[in-house]
Amino acid sequence: MLKACFLFGGKSFEHEVSVSSIRSVFLAYISKKFDITIGGLDLENRLQFFSHEEFLERFQEYSRFEKADRPANYEDLKKFDVVFPLMHGDYVEDGSLQGLFSLFGIPFVGPSVLSSSVCMDKEVAKRLLIQAGLKVADWISLGPFEMLEIEVVTEKIGYPCFVKPASSGSSCGVSKVHSAIELEKAVLEARRFSKKVLIEKAITGMELECAVLGLEDLLASRVGQIIPQKEFYDYESKYVLREAAVIEAPANIPDSLEKEIRQVALKVFRVLDCEMMGRVDFFYDGELYVSEVNTIPGFTPISLYPKLLELTGIGYNELIDQLLEMAIRSHHHRERQAPLAPNSLCLP
């Protein structure tokens, strides 16, 4: 039996979402192929391993792993055949953790260091998508030392608009702004989560999502829709007030629109060099806009990624097995293409 380690937690604003994801997987996933160990990163990114019983007893849904009392060495992860980081946000979804796995030669589920970094920075991803001929909402970015110019926002973006961290997920730090008076407060809130801030034109329309799975051959799932019962689908709506949004899976949309979304989702995946898994989010107001790509989508009880793939014919156990197997296959492929050893010469 192959050995797999499922990781959760980390020094991230989305720490609690990760705990919920790992609980959901642990309670639902039954494998005949993999022997599963659970590893947690505390709020200072210290690693600790847990028995199944200890994990379930210690961590409830959306709880926190404050401090490791039996810290382990990251090199201990090398004893596993594959690692599945069900983790979200800074340090764990932005390429940092992926770089560590790559450095130690550990197979892992998810995209490369570069793809993780690109998708985490919403502005960089937008620029690449535009270059590929895809539509995104208009935006202005504010770097860490740039001042907010309200007149420029009013003229170029208008209201309502969204102010959001450039590199955060789960709607952390996102505000919907209706007038210039609200801008400064929203920018300050977004800067709590990211040095760079985006001010983005609000698209009034449908919020749609498509799950993508695969390596060489990609599969785009059926399309789901988020129907917020509040003004927008913020962190509280997603994880605290679950009745604050209606989730339709599959979405009640024309077949032609679903086909277009699935095709565009595959194109987005390839443009941003993603692999294995990802959820592509869209807005639709008569035209289709790419919102963002989530390279480690949630696996919480309300998460659409596994639900949409199940609608497409891939059950929960099969999905997890496929992801773990893809990670091992992708790692072996990268190893075959590894650069020359330091003492090798590349002569003409």
Question: Where are each of the predicted segments found?
Answer:
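A short small-residue
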Residues: 1-7, 241-250, 304
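ATP-binding N-terminal substructure of ATP-dependent carboxylate-amine bond-forming enzymes
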Residues: 1-109, 113-114, 118-120, 124, ...
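ATP-dependent carboxylate activation and anion-phosphoryl transfer catalytic cores
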Residues: 2, 254-348
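Active-site nucleotide/adenylate-binding loops and adjacent lid/helix of ATP-dependent enzymes
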Residues: 2-8, 12-13, 20, 36, ...
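Short, hinge-like loop/turn segments at secondary-structure boundaries
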Residues: 53-57, 127-128, 155-157, 180, ...
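A glycine- and small-aliphatic-rich helix-loop capping segment at beta-alpha/alpha-beta transitions
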Residues: 99-108, 179, 184, 312
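Phosphate-binding site of ATP-dependent enzymes
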Residues: 178-263, 284-289
